[in-house]
Amino acid sequence: LFNTPLKPLLNWLDVIPVQRHAAQGLTQQIIAEIQKREQIWVGMTPEGTRHNATDFKRGFYHIALGAQVPIVMFAMDYAHKTIYCLGTFCPTGDYEADLEKILALYEGKISAKHPQRLAKPLQKH
């Protein structure tokens, strides 16, 4: 994206480019960026794709845990054209238990334009 006409906008928004194939690893790059800034917002989708994912990628969780920052959860309700902020969650290190608590917050808050493409963990909720 930084080699496109969007570059000035991305720079103005203070978007940080990441090197997906760097030796340090994407998760560690993001943790390092969070730790060296006084204030930062990192946005990502745990599905890691725009298509039907069977599981969440764990990077969002490991980034929050490693940087010692909360996860702020949002849900999109396509039917009502609404975005909900579901609150924050501080990871404990027990991914499976924490994921169940996180998914419970999405209960009844999601309606997708293409429900068949919704990530499997969210289809139950």
PLM regions: where:
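Soluble catalytic domains of membrane acyltransferases
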Residues: L1-G108, L118-H125
